[in-house]
Amino acid sequence: MANSTPKEITIFFDQVLEEFEAMTTMADEANVFPMDKQTAQNSSETVWRPEAQIGDIQNGLDVTGLQTEILELAVPSSLDTIDNDTFTLTSLELRDKRFMQRRAKAAATKLSAQLNQNMANLVAQTGTLVVNQAALPSGYSDIADIEARMDLLEIPIEDQRSVFLDSATYNRMSADLANKDLLGPSPEAALRRSRIGNFAGFETFRTNFQPVLPAAAAPATTVTGKQFHVPTANQTSAGQTFPLDNRGMTLTVSGTATIAAGDVFTIPGVYEVSHISKNDTLQLRTFRVVSIDSGTTMTIYPRIVPLDEIGAGLTRAQGTYANVTTAAPAAASLTWVNTAAGKVSSFWRDGTVEVVAGQIAWDADMFKGANFMRETTSSGIEIVMATEGTAMSGVVDVRLTDYYGLVNTDPQQNGIMGKFA
């Protein structure tokens, strides 16, 4: 027979959940994909999810022979993070309700802070929409610049968009809004509570966990030969066929010695095109270094899929994923964007960053003498609390655990804003 859980411990767990729910700022705005235990075990903790398809338009009455094959790409979603808070409670400490409340808040703060930090770092390092401001962001125009960038790319305006501002930026924007002669409660809320609310088409959130984007070493780096990416659903290795992650590509350059993951660059002549209509936005596409793979190769986001290669290096179906005007030219010099370190404010189209929620098979029948409680939070993450103690020591060991993964499902629909030069 499994041990029963003391009332004090049950109340403590409820308090942890309540505090955790109140602190998961970014996770609450992300998409949640629950991966069940059996799927996780049978797929080595990774499943492939379909990327949004883009249609191809043919004009005219007779479209004989113009049919386009369906090319559906996929993105890997993985469980890879186990966060824990472990501590002991004595029989004396269990008597004090206020002590238990404080420890519950500390536990929830630790777990939620780690989740928020991981999400902020993911977008800060992989989001490809980089809005580099001439001065520190301070008002409506800065958020409006993000809105304009997303609109030019035809990122759906009917979907919710969110921006997560570092505290200093949030307060500067609150001050700007408080000085506006606007209708409604926003100026008063900004003045009294430093609250912005819905601002320039975005839900705004004040955060204290946004990272700093370091300054790039800015080495002189050139592209080795003309390069672009051909969207392909699958790849074959050693006779095995499996999905291909098309979010990025390998770029070969003259050298990578001082380049770092997270660096931002543009390529002369390589301009953005909008996702649906394929209009030239007249803005250089910003790229992120995701990883350094060798002395001359690096993985970058997003992939370079040139509009002018349709019918040549790309089929029409592959061309539906075009995101730039032309390929990276041979010998083109990379222009580094983050020439100065700057505090990041991140933004996204809701649903483009995902929390993969996992489960761990823990129960009292498997671990004799231990008690387990589990609950799924509103952010989709399951919190498990394990307790184990002995009367001889008068001490209860407590372990709080969550298991999840984070994935930037579409780096072309999220990014960062700040002063990086």
Locations of the language-model features?
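Disorder-to-helix initiation segments
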Residues: 5-9, 92-96, 100
